[in-house]
Design a protein with these regions (language model features):
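Short, structured beta-strand/loop micro-motifs enriched in basic residues and often containing a Trp
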Residues: 160-168, 277
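Short beta-strand/loop turn elements enriched in aromatics
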Residues: 135-159, 248-250, 262-267
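His/acidic/aromatic-lined binding-pocket segments of jelly-roll/cupin-type domains
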Residues: 97, 106, 123, 129-132, ...
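An exposed, glycine/acidic-rich loop-and-rim segment of catalytic or binding clefts
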Residues: 151, 169-173, 182-184, 190-244
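A surface-exposed beta-alpha-beta supersecondary segment
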Residues: 255-261
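Ligand-binding loop in jelly-roll beta-barrel domains
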Residues: 101-105, 113, 136-139, 189-208, ...
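Short acidic-glycine-tyrosine-enriched beta hairpin
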Residues: 172-184, 279-299
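Transition-metal
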Residues: 1-151, 215-243
Length: 317
């Protein structure tokens, strides 16, 4: 049964998440605050996914709360049809949206696809993702994505075992990025994000990362392969040459989609106010505010002065 509370957009409060790296200043500044880099460099927006941080006992980490303090996860469980639509009732939102702002380069890592995740982690989702650059600390930042040339598994395994950080990074395509740029990251593609870019990341709703480079980072080697060992983990890595994809391709619709259409989509959506001030469905809204829009929402009044990033899960069917 669809309830009145699940037919209107709801504001979500910030959900800052602990990570092994520092950052987050640009998230604060986006919201008109002075800004500081800390061990909470990410804000998980409209999230029903629990964050995985080895050694930390935080069962609710990563879970978004609505403006009344309730967990979005619980609200969806109480009215799955209203929030997710009839086709997805009782299921998942299918997407995790983050704002992340590293103050340091992240290690080279990759994520499993759905098939690998199902076999090894019992998950219906892997971790294909996409980055939308919202702002940068300087004129531009940089990311590294995919192998420049094919590499055989023995060579790559040697780089990991030796923690040859120079080879791990040099093997990747370096891509300068500026505000407004988009990079699509298929599961299995090795990558790293550089310092100084505020990114809106859309991804499948998991926290699976296989980390090739832990030397110099507060990461234990035994946590790098998610407990399955490197022999198994390397089979999830795409060792082919990769041409960076600087847009959201049609293939992304299987996982998520993003646009700037400030209107209901007939399925669960996360809205991030990228710029402006005004109102969303009568509620005050300004740059940095975030909302979740239920599938049952039919019409939402949005001030013309607001620029909104609409983030969607996989297309139905």
């Amino acid at each position: 049964m669809v309830t009145l509370l699940s037919v209107r957009p709801r504001r979500v409060t910030p959900t800052r998440v602990y990570r092994f790296y520092r950052g987050g200043l640009l998230i604060d500044r986006m919201r008109g605050q002075p800004g500081v880099d800390s061990e909470y460099p990410e804000d998980w927006v409209g999230s029903v996914t629990v964050a995985s941080n080895p050694g930390r006992d935080e069962p609710l980490a990563g879970l978004s709360r609505l403006d009344d303090g309730s967990l979005l996860r619980d609200e969806i469980a109480a009215d799955p049809e209203g929030w997710l639509g009839a086709d997805a009732a009782g299921g998942s939102t299918g997407v995790l949206v983050k704002l992340l702002d590293p103050a340091e380069r992240l290690p080279v890592h990759f994520h499993p696809d759905r098939s690998f995740a199902a076999t090894n982690f019992g998950s219906a989702y892997g971790k294909t993702e996409a980055w939308i650059v919202v702002a940068t600390r300087g004129e531009e930042s940089e990311v590294w994505i995919g192998l420049r040339e094919p590499v055989d598994s023995e060579t790559y395994r040697g780089w990991i075992d030796d923690q040859d950080r120079a080879s791990l990074l040099a093997s990747l395509n370096r891509v300068p990025v500026r505000t407004g740029d988009v990079v699509y990251v298929p599961a299995g593609t090795p990558h790293a994000i550089g310092a100084g870019a505020l990114i809106a990341e859309l991804q499948e709703p998991t926290d699976f990362s296989i980390v090739c480079e832990w030397a110099g980072f507060p990461i234990r080697p035994e946590d790098s392969h998610l407990g399955i060992g490197w022999d198994a983990a390397l089979s999830a890595l795409d060792l082919r040459a990769h041409t960076p994809i600087r847009e959201l391709p049609d293939a992304a619709r299987e996982f998520f989609w993003a646009d700037e259409l400030a209107e209901p989509a007939g399925r669960f959506a996360v809205w991030i106010v990228l710029d402006g001030s005004g109102s969303v469905d009568g509620a005050p809204a300004r740059t940095g505010d975030c909302f979740v829009v239920p599938a049952a929402a039919e019409q939402v009044e949005v001030s013309s002065g607001l620029r909104i990033l609409r983030c969607l899960g996989p297309e139905p069917g």
